[in-house]
Amino acid sequence: MNAPVFNLDNVMMPAEFRHCFDAQRKAYLAHHEPSHAERSADLQSLARLLKENRDALVAAINLDYGNRSEFETLFTEYFVSLEAIHDAGKNLKRWMKPQKRRVDQMTYPGARNRVIPQPLGVVGVIVPWNFPLNLSFTPLAAILAAGNRAMVKMSENSRHLAALLASLSPKYLPEDKLKFFDDGGGRGPAFSSLPFDHLLFTGSGQTGRAVMANAARNLTPVTLELGGKSPAIVAADFPLEAAAERI
């Protein structure tokens, strides 16, 4: 079955998307190579958002799920996100250093070559409902460490978490650096049609094809993580109430 390719000429662009993108693009062009100290401070702010709002984040995810094990949220999302931020901070200096590359001296005698890491600009992230904290903050750790700015669109099935993050994030990072969006439904095509410098998507293959087609209109590079189901097997002799709570 082929995925639908949206006609972007007829897509209504929410004003908040365009306004935020323009603000982040302007901020990036005015200050396109943040220092190690600035990037480190951004990562610390991201970690503080998680640490200072742990209970509220867990509660919001539980509301979106209807009922979700606190243990699962903490160990598959919360601690994983903190570890990603910590790892980025620990490796940041090394990641920012220029890297030497070999040059064929027969072809280019006396030449030297090196790769200088540079920020891309404004990065978009489309987050699914199943692991909404992990799949927003883990990429954000890399995005901010690389000196970029980010717009994050949450799933329409993560309304409570999206609203919470949208209200919390400006207290830790300015909106021209990071902004979360709630998806009231049907806004994905508009988001993926923005001229990002890179776009990350996690979800189904069918939706991934549509996202890639939209991004192609702007020659936006994309990273697609395309998945399926996460089955759980409950043995006949295991207590059903305990299984339901943990799953």
Where do the protein language model's features map onto the residues?
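N-terminal Rossmann-like NAD(P)+-binding subdomain of aldehyde/semialdehyde dehydrogenases
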Residues: 1-113
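ALDH superfamily catalytic-core signature
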Residues: 11-13, 206-247
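Residue-level signal for inorganic ion chemistry
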Residues: 39, 85, 147, 178, ...
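Conserved small-residue-rich beta-alpha loop and adjacent elements
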Residues: 104-172, 219, 241
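A structured beta-alpha segment of the ubiquitous adenosine-cofactor-binding alpha/beta core
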Residues: 112-113, 179-197
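Short beta->alpha connector loops at strand-helix junctions that form conserved
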Residues: 148, 153-155, 182, 202-203, ...
